[in-house]
Amino acid sequence: MRHRGVATLAALGFALAVAGCGGGGGGGDGTPLTKAQYEQHLATDSQAITKAFQPLSTPPSSLSVLASQLKVGQEKLRSAADDLNGVTPPKDVEKDNQALAKGLQTLADELESLRSAAAKKDPALVQKALNGLKSSHALVDARAATDDMRKKGYKLGGFS
């Protein structure tokens, strides 16, 4: 059962990477980024989030290790959300950018119950938290935003 839960979490991490996330620099002065600048911005943090959640692609050696990995992942999600909130995206993806930033921040917050359960080394709480994440709207909202960006011709990291 623990393996299924970890597989679900790994799928969440992969889906986040596929969703594409913000990156550092540019566009914070109110001047909209160009499409190419914005695509580069998305690619940068997408890679950071992929790297942060990579350890979750295999079952962790312990719940303590899982808690540590989740903490890093949460930090990357929050950083990406902050980056997205700090830039001026191209006009045609302003709403998508806001939805993606909100989705990433919300998901980072929602992962706290899982991280806390893992830190307590309580498998039953971990499973309960994983079940709660399965019904999260944050990932769905972020995915909808990136799907819309793709329809508008944006390349999101190496995943489009």
Regions found by a protein language model. Give the residues of each.
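Bacterial N-terminal signal peptides that target proteins for export
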Residues: 1-10
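Bacterial signal peptide processing site
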Residues: 22-25
